[in-house]
Amino acid sequence: MKMMTIYIISLLLMIGFVAFASKPSPIYGGLSLVVSGGLGCGMVVSLEDVFLGLVVFLVYLGGMLVVFGYTTAMATEEYPETWVGNVVAFIMLLFVLLLQVGWYFMSKLVYIIMAIKLFDFVETSLVGQDYNGVSQLYYCGGWALALLGWILFMTIYVVLEVVRERSY
C-alpha cells in the first residue's frame, strides 16, 4: 500500500510540474508550484521522515506563498491565460502518464529504497529521526537556519524591488 501511495504521489507531482511548465498566467503557475511542493513534502512524510517534511512544508511553502503573493498582486491580469491554450503540454503529459501506468502494470516492479526507518538500530544506537530533528536543527544547523532565513528575506526584498513601479 505504501509503495502505491508513493507512486500515485509521484504521478501527481509530475502533473504539477507539467502544469507549471505549460506557462500559464502567474496566478496558476504559483498555484501549481505550491501544489507540487506540498506533494513533494507528502512524499517525504510517506517515507517516514515526518519532521523533515514538516520543516520543508512550513519554510519552503511559507516563503513561496509570500513571494507569489507579492508577485501575483503586482502582475494581475484582467483576463489571465489558462491551461486550455497549451494543448501540446497536456498531450505530452497524458502520453508520459500512459507510459508510466503501462510500465507499472506490465512489470509489477516498483522499488523504493529506504536506508534508515524510524527507530532503527544502526550499529549500537537507536535512531529516532523525528525526535532528534528539532535539537539538531537548532544545535548543528543553527547557522544554516539563520542563513536560509536571511536568503528568504533577501529574495522577498529583491522581488519587491523588481516589481515595484518606478516614478520619475
Swiss-Prot record:
It is a multi-pass membrane protein. One of its GO terms (cellular component) is mitochondrial inner membrane. It is an enzyme of class 7 (translocase). It comes from the Eukaryota. It is found in: Mitochondrion inner membrane. InterPro entries: ComplexI_Subunit6 (IPR050269), NADH_UbQ/plastoQ_OxRdtase_su6 (IPR001457), Nuo/plastoQ_OxRdtase_6_NuoJ (IPR042106). Core subunit of respiratory chain NADH dehydrogenase (Complex I) which is composed of 45 different subunits. The chain crosses the membrane at residues 1-21, 27-47, 50-70, 87-107, 143-163. Keywords: Electron transport, Membrane, Mitochondrion, Mitochondrion inner membrane, NAD, Respiratory chain, Translocase, Transmembrane, Transmembrane helix, Transport, Ubiquinone. Its EC number is 7.1.1.2. Core subunit of the mitochondrial membrane respiratory chain NADH dehydrogenase (Complex I) which catalyzes electron transfer from NADH through the respiratory chain, using ubiquinone as an electron acceptor. Essential for the catalytic activity and assembly of complex I. Belongs to the complex I subunit 6 family. It catalyses: a ubiquinone + NADH + 5 H(+)(in) = a ubiquinol + NAD(+) + 4 H(+)(out). GO terms for molecular function: NADH dehydrogenase (ubiquinone) activity. This is NADH-ubiquinone oxidoreductase chain 6. One of its GO terms (biological process) is mitochondrial electron transport, NADH to ubiquinone.
